[in-house]
């Protein structure tokens, strides 16, 4: 079986090596001629999968995309040809949720304003919004969810209006897809009027799409209201964010909230599982076996951690300050934004760090937060 795979997709050899011959290709320049005799095609978002690419192939058994979105894939064409397709929804959700949570802990320390006791509004309750809520709820934080589409679909969770979040939330974390038209348009969902309506001292975290906030309006409002604190991982006009906006953010990064080693591996692993299912063979590989050993074997806790100690545990896994500093130093360079993304040392997730604790205090919340080893 000939497996054509984007050369930048990780962990392909250990997962798919037993299933066929792996042929790495440049996903951006892939041609119909290269695909002609492939049995399996594994791509990323840089490859347009359509009739032009696949019309010369009559033996394709499976197309997989190690991505959350499917904008680059002509799903109707694949369905017409009866070619099975799978992507990797939610593969980086844990990474995004932990990134947002860590950013909130960092702001809490910087401004001596504890996260505990605050109300967090999450706009968008899909995979990444749900992962963020999971972290916050594990820590005992009250969460308000806004997602009119999920609510209309009958999702059993409690939802509130965006106006309620604007009025009540101390922190707002954005997790919606970009939608440019229709009833639930998200482009400039946070326009000048909504930004001005935010509660005093609101923290605004954006880990979804830059266009969800009107960036020009954000500059204007932030200059008028220094009480607003910003964490921006995404920007209008990527890869060239407005240079005057970056200094106004407390933490600024180049669209890397989802960049974890676990998330990267999970995307490929989900495609491996799907192909094994299609071939009716056992998926006997383990996701954990793919990942390198974490550089800290375990952390012994003498007591259940307070918020300052929790931030230190989080920093053992990922220190947001490092990426923030690097981004500020490089984003104005030619290709600085994309270069930092391409060369990013994918961080680990909380699960990489084992905690050892023999005390009597209740520490299940650390396990719920994602750390391993707690209470075991």
UniProtKB/Swiss-Prot annotation:
GO terms for cellular component: cytoplasm. Pathway: Cofactor biosynthesis; pyridoxine 5'-phosphate biosynthesis; pyridoxine 5'-phosphate from D-erythrose 4-phosphate: step 2/5. The keyword Secreted does not apply. One of its GO terms (biological process) is pyridoxine biosynthetic process. It catalyses: 4-phospho-D-erythronate + NAD(+) = (R)-3-hydroxy-2-oxo-4-phosphooxybutanoate + NADH + H(+). SUPFAM superfamilies: Formate/glycerate dehydrogenase catalytic domain-like, NAD(P)-binding Rossmann-fold domains. Coiled coil: none annotated. Its EC number is 1.1.1.290. It is found in: Cytoplasm. Its main location: cytoplasm. NAD(+) binds at residues 147, 233, 258. Keywords: Cytoplasm, NAD, Oxidoreductase, Pyridoxine biosynthesis. Substrate binds at residues 45, 67, 259. The keyword Magnesium does not apply. One of its GO terms (molecular function) is 4-phosphoerythronate dehydrogenase activity. The active site is at 209, 238, 255 (proton donor). Homodimer. Catalyzes the oxidation of erythronate-4-phosphate to 3-hydroxy-2-oxo-4-phosphonooxybutanoate. Belongs to the D-isomer specific 2-hydroxyacid dehydrogenase family. PdxB subfamily. This is Erythronate-4-phosphate dehydrogenase. It comes from Shewanella baltica (strain OS185). The gene is pdxB.
